[in-house]
Amino acid sequence: MKYLILSLVANLLVFGVLSAIGLNINILAAMMIVLVIPIMISGIVFFKTNIDKTYIFFNIIFIDFYYYIYNVHLMTLPKFNNYIKTEMMELEHIDVLITSKDFGFDEILFFTLYLLLILIVLYYLKKQLKNKT
C-alpha cells in the first residue's frame, strides 16, 4: 500500500510541477512529459508492490484525474488561446491538431488505454520474472 501512495504522490508532484510551469514550456515537451514521466514512475514502483491489480486500477484512475485537472487548468489560463496559435505556427510541419477549449472524452480514453496497455505489459513481465526465480 505504501508503494501505491508513493506512486500517486510522485505523479501528483509531476502534474503539479507541470501546472506551475503552465504555458512556459513547448507543447511537444509537455506532451512527452505527460506521456512518459507518470508511466515511468508507476512502472518503477509497480515492481516493488504486491497488490498488482489494485495498484494498476488506482494508478490509472488517479493519473487520468491528474491529467484532466492539468488540462482544465491550462485551458483556463488567460494566455491559452494565444499560446495555441503560436504553437500551431511552430508545428506547421508536424500533423498535430490542438484546438482551444476542446478537451474531452477521447483524450481521456486514449490516456486510459495507453496506461492500461503499458501496465498490463508490466504485469505480465513481473509475473514472468517471479516465475523464473
UniProtKB/Swiss-Prot annotation:
Q: Write out the transmembrane intervals.
A: 3-23, 27-47, 55-75, 103-123
Domain of life per record: Bacteria
Looking at the UniProt record for this protein, which Gene Ontology cellular component terms does it annotate, in alphabetical order?
A: plasma membrane
Query: What are the entry keywords?
Result: Cell membrane, Membrane, Transmembrane, Transmembrane helix
Report the locations given in the UniProt record: Cell membrane
Principal place where this protein is found?
A: membrane
Q: How does it sit in the membrane?
A: Multi-pass membrane protein
NCBIfam families hit by this protein: membran_MsaC (NF038270)
Sum up the protein's function in the record's words. Accessory element involved in the expression of sarA and several virulence factors. Modulates SarA production and/or function in a strain-dependent manner. Affects the transcription of the accessory gene regulator (agr) and genes encoding virulence factors including alpha toxin (hla) and protein A (spa).
UniProt-recorded name of the protein: Protein msa
Species of origin reads: Staphylococcus aureus (strain MRSA252)
Name the gene that codes for it.
msa
